[in-house]
């Protein structure tokens, strides 16, 4: 800009000098040439000023658009990460209810439905339809502003499959309670779990899926993983099959898992992730139980869940280590017979309880 001003000044000075010079040296051609040069410089200066104004307006608009985009994006993601304890408060404030022999589905409005089948299949649709074992049992009114929760309570000896309204599939193990909404809103997908579930989460990059428990939560976009969080046990765990998950405890400490990794949670504290063979942790979905160098008391705790039978173990039996694989579709008598090939034990039935005794001192 300064250069253009200097050029115009230079030409103007020459024009003034020309007027002061002798008329003999003045010709119309010279005058026209000087005037054209002045007009040319003025046009250049005007064009430059116009270009600068356009560039300024464009730059200012771009910066404003970027900041607006950042603000809106921040607002969008803040809706995910602002702590919302609605479902946790609901789950923890419910009167403890256990299912003695049948699977119980508690729907909004205190409606209780007994699901008789051992391996029931419950499906929620986006339009509000609920189907249990191919039978439509309820047509829910979808309300945009009101979040209503369901509870699925599985007794010992039973398992079920649950499909949520977004298409996420859950395999729910024995002795488990799951709290979930009839449908998910646009900003949040959350469920609450006590017990054990295996999940195949429907992928939605705009809406993370969060599994909450008493001591920790797991956040994903779409993946396959197992959560074990029985209140009666001192340890919980998360095992990742596919994708990635982020686990966060109540102290906000976070751990990220890669496929084939497990994290244990003791009293709410996250251990370091470790690589494991995932099959023993997830084979219950296929009605199998795998164990390698496991104490017998842990094996029988799992059998207590799967079959709903109470086992009383001789102290000498509790810490015996066994390895093997059990088909949980078989009768309990056959399963116990299989275990007896791995350890020196025998069984006695008394008062609807099974006593597991040692053969060593007989």
Language model features with spans:
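Gram-positive cell-envelope targeting signals
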Residues: 12-19, 35, 66, 75
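N-terminal cationic amphipathic segment used for targeting or macromolecule association
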Residues: 10, 62-63
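A residue-level detector for the "anchor" residue at the start of short, highly conserved motifs
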Residues: 46, 50-60, 69-360
């Amino acid at each position: 800009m300064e250069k253009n001003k200097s050029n115009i000044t230079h030409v103007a000075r020459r024009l003034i000098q020309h007027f002061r010079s002798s008329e003999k040296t003045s010709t119309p051609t010279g005058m026209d040439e000087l005037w054209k040069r002045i007009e040319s410089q003025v046009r250049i200066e005007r064009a430059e000023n116009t270009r600068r104004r356009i560039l300024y307006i464009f730059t200012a608009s771009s910066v404003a658009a970027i900041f607006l985009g950042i603000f809106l994006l921040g607002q969008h993601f803040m809706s995910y990460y602002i702590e919302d304890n609605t479902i946790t408060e609901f789950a923890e404030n419910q009167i403890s209810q256990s299912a003695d022999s049948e699977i119980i589905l508690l729907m909004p409005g205190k409606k209780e439905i007994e699901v008789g089948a051992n391996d029931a299949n419950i499906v929620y649709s986006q339009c509000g339809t609920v189907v249990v074992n191919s039978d439509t049992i309820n047509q829910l009114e979808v309300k945009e502003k009101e979040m209503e929760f369901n509870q699925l309570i599985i007794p010992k000896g039973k398992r079920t499959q649950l499909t949520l309204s977004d298409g996420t599939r859950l395999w729910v193990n024995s002795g488990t309670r799951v709290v979930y909404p009839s449908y998910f809103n646009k900003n949040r997908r959350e469920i609450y779990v006590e017990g054990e579930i295996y999940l195949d989460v429907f992928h939605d990059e705009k809406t993370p899926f969060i599994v909450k428990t008493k001591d920790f939560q797991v956040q994903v976009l779409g993946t396959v993983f197992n959560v074990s969080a029985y209140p009666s046990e001192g340890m919980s765990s998360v095992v990742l099959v596919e994708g990635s998950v982020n686990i966060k405890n109540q102290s906000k400490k976070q751990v990220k898992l890669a496929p084939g990794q497990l994290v244990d949670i003791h009293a709410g504290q996250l251990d370091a992730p470790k690589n494991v063979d995932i099959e023993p942790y997830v084979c219950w979905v296929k009605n199998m139980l795998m164990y390698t160098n496991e104490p017998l008391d842990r094996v029988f705790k799992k059998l207590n869940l799967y079959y709903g039978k109470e086992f009383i173990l001789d102290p000498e039996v509790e810490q015996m280590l066994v390895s093997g694989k059990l088909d949980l579709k078989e009768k309990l008598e056959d399963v116990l017979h299989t275990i007896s090939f791995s350890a020196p034990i025998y069984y006695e039935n008394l008062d609807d309880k099974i006593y597991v005794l040692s053969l060593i001192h007989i």
